[in-house]
Amino acid sequence: MPHSLTPYLSRTIADDTGLPVSTILMNLPVGWENKFRTLIMEIDDISPSSMVKLDIRDGVLYISVNESSKYHKLMTLVTRALSQESARVCMMCGEFGKRRKEQEHKPCLCRPHYLDYINYEEA
């Protein structure tokens, strides 16, 4: 049986017409969903349907914005800051986390969740 984090280690969802906020939120690990929910909803309020791609790789969240959006430059800056912050937030609980180089997929985890994850992998 896979670890509950496994589906989130590498994930890409794209739609050129815009991803609904509900789709983005339901495809985030719970720690990131809780931490970034408000910001993602505000991005959509400012520029509806501007988020066209969600990508999770190596413990970092990437959200791409439609280039034809009126607020493309602003949204790109906001989503870039969100990506940088996601690299310091535990995917499981939303507390401070970090990516460890020795991990194959480098999930961003706090110490307790990291220990749980490596113990699970070794079992």
Segments and roles (model prediction):
Residues 1-76:
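Long, charged N-terminal interaction/targeting segments
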Residues 4-5, 118-121:
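Extended, charged helical/alpha-beta scaffold domains that provide interaction surfaces
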Residues 79-81, 86:
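Detector for the mature cores of small, proteolytically processed
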Residues 84, 92-95, 119:
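Catalytic-core loop-and-flanking beta/alpha module that positions acidic residues
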Residues 86-89, 97, 103-106:
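Short metal-coordination and nucleic-acid-contact micro-motifs, chiefly zinc-binding Cys/His arrays
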Residues 90-93, 110:
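Short cysteine-rich clusters marking metal-coordination/redox-active sites
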Residues 96-101, 115-118:
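Short functional micro-motifs and their immediate structural scaffolds
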Residues 104-116:
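Cysteine-rich micro-motifs
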